[in-house]
């Protein structure tokens, strides 16, 4: 909270395709969707943010489309599969990490749990047949519940699931957090697990506890760090919470504590009127993070490249970190403009 300002770097295929979620890439190859050909100027990005007073840069290493901006050994749907960029030898996350290390900028990792592309997402047998269906239990023509097909139990569904998405996600966490070339001096201060999921997404339970243990093993006290890694979207393990809107505004009265139940793995941050207001007597400190778009979208595009005015940005500041009783951390997207990449 004392840092006040964090930058949110949204960069990936969506940057080149004028979209936000990447739900319709289908079978397009990395070369078709990731159209970067010139070298990525990470140093200018980080240096500019540092000079502007930002203390942390959170990077979307994998957004909902499933494309990885680092060279991943877990998938070919990544920057190394985009052979038009540095002959398949590029690694954008490594480039940003190197710049953050040189300029001593704290880093956060955004790794979307929802993955539109990877075939392990959801529950399917070896033939690719779905093991879970979305059904209408109220007989009103509106599907409302996911349940196993053909009378299977949930245990049988998990046994017959041909590919384990939770393992895939966990292995990618290890791949990034366990490699010293990623992060500021090999370290991430925060991991962002976005709860967004499209209406047409397959059903998938997340093994959050396993993921949290992995994160802290590398980035927390268990990994010989001074403090545990801050976690966003981590249910009862959340230590950085969403402010409740994407306007950059906190409630007039915002408290930093939430009520969590570790046994039930639930969190209550007193959500009301588009804000998470927190509680004065909650049992867990959860930094309220006020994220906002600096233009009309999270990703840059020709149709959404006009930034908000100084008056609008000033209002965001004063309605988030600018007043002592709001106590929120303000997070703005640092766009990767195609013109900046050289």
Could you describe each region identified by the protein language model?
Residues 1-342:
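Mature catalytic domains of secreted/periplasmic carbohydrate-active enzymes
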């Amino acid at each position: 909270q004392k840092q006040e300002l964090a930058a949110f770097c949204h960069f990936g295929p969506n940057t080149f395709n004028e979209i936000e979620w990447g739900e319709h890439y289908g079978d397009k190859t990395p070369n078709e969707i990731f159209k970067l050909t010139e070298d990525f100027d990470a140093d200018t990005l980080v240096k500019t943010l540092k000079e502007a007073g930002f203390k942390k840069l959170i990077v979307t290493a994998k957004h909902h489309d499933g494309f990885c901006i680092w060279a991943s050994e877990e998938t070919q749907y990544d920057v190394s599969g985009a052979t038009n960029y540095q002959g398949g030898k590029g690694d954008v996350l490594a480039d940003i990490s190197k710049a953050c290390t040189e300029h001593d900028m704290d880093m956060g990792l955004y790794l979307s749990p929802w993955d539109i592309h990877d075939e392990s997402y959801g529950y399917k047998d070896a033939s690719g047949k779905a093991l879970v269906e979305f059904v209408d239990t109220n007989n009103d023509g509106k599907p409302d519940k996911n349940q196993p097909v053909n009378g299977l139990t949930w245990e049988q569904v998990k046994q017959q699931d041909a590919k384990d998405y939770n393992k895939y996600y966990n292995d990618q966490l290890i791949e990034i957090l366990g490699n010293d070339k990623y992060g500021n001096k090999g370290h991430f201060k925060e991991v962002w697990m976005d709860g967004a999921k499209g209406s047409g997404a397959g059903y998938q339970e997340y093994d959050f506890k396993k993921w949290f243990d992995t994160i802290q093993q590398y980035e927390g006290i268990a990994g010989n760090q001074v403090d545990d890694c801050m976690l966003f979207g981590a249910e009862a393990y959340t230590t950085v919470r969403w402010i409740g809107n994407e306007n950059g505004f906190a409630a007039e009265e915002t408290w930093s504590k939430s009520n969590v139940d570790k046994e039930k793995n639930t969190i209550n941050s007193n959500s009301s009127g588009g804000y998470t207001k927190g509680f004065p007597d909650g049992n867990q400190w959860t930094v309220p993070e006020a994220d906002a778009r600096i233009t009309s979208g999270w990703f840059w595009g020709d149709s959404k490249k006009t930034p908000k005015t100084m008056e609008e940005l000033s209002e965001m500041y004063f309605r988030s970190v600018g007043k002592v009783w709001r106590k929120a951390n303000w997070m703005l997207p640092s766009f990767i403009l195609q013109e900046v990449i050289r």
